[in-house]
């Protein structure tokens, strides 16, 4: 906390001095907690749900009302809608199945088996029979069966489960039996039901839309087909409705997603629930992609199918696949990867990778941590001293009840060199998935590497960590370890850097895995010629 009164008094006496000196009150974050190792965290929406919401708003802007159509459809409705084509259509439908409820009696043999488990049945026989009978009749849910058996016999639920497994094997041998109910394979099967019920409840004309999941029994899933998908469908019912309404709706809807220019091409499929010569494919031009894309289908429902539902006015239906539109909008190549990204490779961008490059060892004690900054500044200032030369830094620390006098000596004994090597100010960058050390100046860099390094510096993400920074933290971290272990001296020698660990750096395994799998590189090679002796008294 700031001592506000002292600061105000200091500022009143000498504002400039107070302004400069109080900067030390703003403590910088530790290096592993500084940018770009910290990054903003945002929630992330799913592209399919984004597209659904955009489609909802687009339909609402066009005056449509939103409805939810039935997901479970009786196969009789498929026959009513498709006529003789129904059998072929039902082949792509999922049928709902359920386990039958076995007629389980409480015979003398089963009573004997229960009693062998140490449970007295005689007092509870009638209660147990009622439970088994209730399950058979459907008045007791299956997920309550174990609990009710346990309560009836006054035993634990674990023992109740054992009875169900050991005494009533009939439950384990059950096989699902298919019903006549199907999961909606396309939105049309629901529209007939909805429009039929609204005919005597809403004035004509009316415009409805629904965006919901459909299920299709594809032979296999591939980059453009899933067994479950979302349909964004609408229906317009009223006198005078025809395919021209479909064209206008297609243009109005899709123009809100960046499409321009539309082609309406007769669909060769000719589904029997559409009036002949009305089933139409919509192709739209996308200026960004510079392509014509098939994006929707519409048609006018057949009077034959409509009449079976008591609908006596034309109904135009338009539908499009949400996933298809999301793929176009997001430039995805594979619907599986777009819908289920968690099952596919996650690509880290350069910013992500940069946040995963950190110092391996950092001192914990504030005094020693602060020494690092002084050490870095001295090294940078004196890096070009001509050898033989040395740089000495002395400090006294309080460690527990003792005083520690520390002398750090950085030296170069060999003649004709500098105190520190030419790569000492190299900085770690992430560029195009690579982790590279880039020099402060490109003087003397070979032409074959120069272009890549220049691009890395201008287009890559800087980590803000230079070799000298990381190495100085290595020195002070070892100093802290020496305090703890009561060591009196140690040396640090790093002549040539070949890997991140040589300069006290590490990278997250997730980033490392991507670098290796994508044939990217970690190249931090360079001469630093660091020689350090530390003595502690």
Swiss-Prot record:
Pfam families in the record: SepRS_C, tRNA-synt_2d
SUPFAM superfamilies: Class II aaRS and biotin synthetases
Any GO BP: tRNA aminoacylation
Catalytic activity: tRNA(Cys) + O-phospho-L-serine + ATP = O-phospho-L-seryl-tRNA(Cys) + AMP + diphosphate
Binding site for substrate: 186-188, 231-233, 273-274, 317
Enzyme Commission number(s) from the entry: 6.1.1.27
Class of enzymatic activity (EC top level): ligase
Quaternary structure, from the entry: Homotetramer. Interacts with SepCysS.
Family the entry assigns: Belongs to the class-II aminoacyl-tRNA synthetase family. O-phosphoseryl-tRNA(Cys) synthetase subfamily.
Protein name: O-phosphoserine--tRNA(Cys) ligase
Naturally occurring in which organism (per UniProt): Methanococcus maripaludis (strain DSM 14266 / JCM 13030 / NBRC 101832 / S2 / LL)
